[in-house]
Amino acid sequence: MKYGFAGSLAAACLAFCLFFCPRLEAGKPNVIFIMVDDLGWMDLACQGNKVVDTPNIDRFAAEGMRFTSAYAAAPVCTPTRAAVLTGKSPARLHITTHAPGGFLPKASKFLPAKTLIDLPLEHLTIAERLGAAGYRNAFLGKWHLAGDSRRGANGKGNVEFYPEAQGFHINIGGCAYGGPPTYFDPYRIHTLPPRKKGEYLPDRLVDEAISFI
């Protein structure tokens, strides 16, 4: 039985979640959700950055809604992603640090909280909710919710917890990796086949996103 989805927003390698209604109906807008790891509150030009230009993101901010007092659910990637997908706090999900865990120094006097390294399938995700409402969903980029990337070749991990099992119809690049082995093709990511040697990973993901749209 799936647990209920509670609304949540958190901003946190790069991932796109694309939710599109094949026949756009009134009240059912298409959705593009972009998550960026380790993004500081003033890293975007629209937030006051005077060094880096981010014109496209600035346009999103100007034409959409800005949450000026929002906080990420956790300071690291895996629990934040799990929280965004499910609307639940990392503590309730038992995902409290980035997979595969075990990052405390060996000499530490503290015991780490028991943490899962997969997103259990019984938790209902926003992708599953939107799929039930008629949306077709794609995931592109970093997933990092499918076990230990050292299990299997090229970040395979636990395939039974991939985006396809969590409400996404298309998965491009999502696997157990917490970061790509390289940012240039060939990427050595088994869910992202080589296309053009030397190609830059962010460019590839954007091309794939545009193709899906």
Residues of each region from the PLM?
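Formylglycine-dependent sulfatase
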Residues: 4, 22-213
